Amino acid sequence: MAGQTVIVSGLNPAAILQSTIGGAPPSTAAAAAENGDTTRKVVPLSKDALQDFMVSIITQKLQGEKKPFYVLDLGEVVSLMDQWNVALPNVRPFYAVKCNPEPSFLSMLAAMGSNFVCASRAEIEYVLSLGISPERIVFANPCKPESDIIFAEKVGVNLTTYDSEDEVYKIKKHHPKCELLLRIKPMNDGNARCPMGPKYGALPEEIEPLLRIAQASRLTVSGVSFHIGSGDADSNAYLGAIAAAKQVFETAAKFGMSKMNVLDIGGGFTSGHQFTTAATAVKSALQQHFSNEPELTIIAEPGRFFAETAFTLATTIIGKRVRGDLREYWINDGLYGSMNCVLYDHATVTATPLACMSNRVNLNCSGSKMFPSTIFGPTCDALDTVLRDYHVPELQVNDWVIFPNMGAYTKAAGSNFNGFNTSAIVTHLAYAYPS
């Protein structure tokens, strides 16, 4: 297995890992240490050995403090990039840093050719600290503090989004060389779990005035951006949004503006079947509306597509209560921590038991009686309830509960409420080769 080679965008994963981890700049190590992760060792293993790897980490913790931890499977990231390049070869991914800014994850994406969209000065600083050049960053926040615009000008981030008159004036004043993408509101948000339309995007009647204002301010509008919303959106929403973007291109040409050369189709991609149907819809719409634009650069802002399935969270049972047939468990992470995704991202989490203390011979308790169970987070707020009426085998304090698919809007959006420090959760690195 050590000699196995997987090619991603012409890169050898062994070389990627060396440049990502072993050859990381000091700033990467500093960022990792700041996040409670001082080890950058990558463990190669087979795809079906991820649980064994987690058990080995847990075994090391049995005599010490049993803190939650993540495992990042870099092999999954490689597989996802392969899928992207096959399905959307002409669409360049700009990873949405807000989704999960884990440093080794970002470095891996960068090594495979991904660029980045940032929403704030802090995110730009973080990406730059990893040795990524400012030319690979889009400041994709339509409403920015003036201080952040000044910073973007200083460090050379020269592409941003706008959807209001005031934003044009701020950019004209503080960063006049910055090129603009007009953010438009899709008329169909695709029933996304997290729609973006209520907050961002120019309405149809606002597009011409916003183009005119930018033109009068002598700013360059290089293209159009949109976002259909995040999480399980209807892929057909891309069809209408791309058609609307084409109309903006035509309007700008009618006004005598510089030829637009960038189309940003936003995010909303989820790995699996949704991505397949979304990619088909995107390619169909691009063929219909932009087939005669050979100079056009098409970009997207995937976040959860790359992050969600690459991370697995391990938590410890710190308390238990029995009420008849009901089992109630307390774990050491919850809705104020990594599981904030249940509230704010409308996620559905699944739990897998690892009876590392009570049943080491049968870790997953296969064949055991199942009990209706409630799983609480560690804080004193009753809202901090991760799962209700969830059937799991009988578990004990110091057993573990594993949560797969925990990479999207989890640790990145957690808090330190009640003194439970989400930012201190360690991430261990693995590279699982396909079975």
Swiss-Prot record:
This protein's UniProt keywords: Decarboxylase, Lyase, Polyamine biosynthesis, Pyridoxal phosphate
EC number(s) per entry: 4.1.1.17
Single GO molecular function: ornithine decarboxylase activity
Activity regulation statement: Inhibited by antizyme (AZ) in response to polyamine levels. AZ inhibits the assembly of the functional homodimer by binding to ODC monomers and targeting them for ubiquitin-independent proteolytic destruction by the 26S proteasome.
GO biological process, one term: putrescine biosynthetic process from arginine, via ornithine
Active site: C380
Inducing stimuli: By virus infection. Up-regulated during the later stages of ripening.
Catalysed reaction, written as an equation: L-ornithine + H(+) = putrescine + CO2
Known cofactor(s): pyridoxal 5'-phosphate
Residues found modified as N6-(pyridoxal phosphate)lysine: K98
UniProt binding sites for substrate: Y344, D345, D381
Marked site: Stacks against the aromatic ring of pyridoxal phosphate and stabilizes reaction intermediates: H227
Keyword check for Zinc: no
Keyword Acetylation among record annotations: no
Membrane spanning stretches: none
Enzyme class: lyase
Pfam family, one: Orn_DAP_Arg_deC
Functional note: Catalyzes the first and rate-limiting step of polyamine biosynthesis that converts ornithine into putrescine, which is the precursor for the polyamines, spermidine and spermine. Polyamines are essential for cell proliferation and are implicated in cellular processes, ranging from DNA replication to apoptosis.
Subunit structure, as described in the record: Homodimer. Only the dimer is catalytically active, as the active sites are constructed of residues from both monomers.
UniProt similarity note: Belongs to the Orn/Lys/Arg decarboxylase class-II family.
Protein name: Ornithine decarboxylase
Name of the gene: ODC
